Amino acid sequence: MSVNICELTYKEFSELVPHKVDTAILPIGTMEAHGCTNLGTDITIPEFIAREIAGKINALIAPTINYGITRSLLPYPGSMTVSQDSFIRYVGDVMESLFRAGFKKLVIINGHGGHIDELKKLAIEVWRKTGGKTVIIHWWELVEPMTREFFGEAGGHAGLDETAMVLAANPELVKPELCRDVIPYQFRAGTYVYPAAGPIILYKPGEGMPMFDLEKAKEYARKVVDLIADFIVVVFKGWEKNLAEKS
């Protein structure tokens, strides 16, 4: 039986939720320029992670939210956005609907830094309305120490970490030749630049440029998936033990 909710019949869903499966995974991304990877990089990575962790945490995967809040790279070709208000209302409605459908726990795999504050607010508000528990994974932040240990340097927007994950998910979506024509933008604290001065944004001087080693990318992706799954399991155990009487 499929782990994707949209591929189940309503009878199959009723047999699973919540008796056998009480957790849903919701990938969230946006459409945004990413150097030499696809415009949907922030979608591709959360969907890949969701597929890889579903079996590890006994979860079903909800349909992805593909449109998000794009800011600094919105002027670049192909970048798209929705308003902050629309995003909050829509994602909140989706979260509430998942809980009312029978899920008790929700894992949001977020692929875009522009959603961090909004998703935190939503997790709290939706809990107040439904009692549903949410864990939000900003994957690149959670795995940053491992990224530095694995590559010996930090990642960046459309940098080595995101490029490696897309490469592991679908090598055809990575176009190394495009990087030759891209001047990366080096972020500097104490400044604000709009629009961003490049579709590759580096946060540490001399660190984070994309890499294109497929085998190394696959190894990195495995570590990312394991780290995320392990963290979620710890959270679930904490909820089960410490909130059992309040659920």
Language-model segments: what does each one mean?
Residues 1-85, 89-107, 113-247:
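Extended, histidine- and acidic-residue-enriched regions that form the cofactor-binding/catalytic faces
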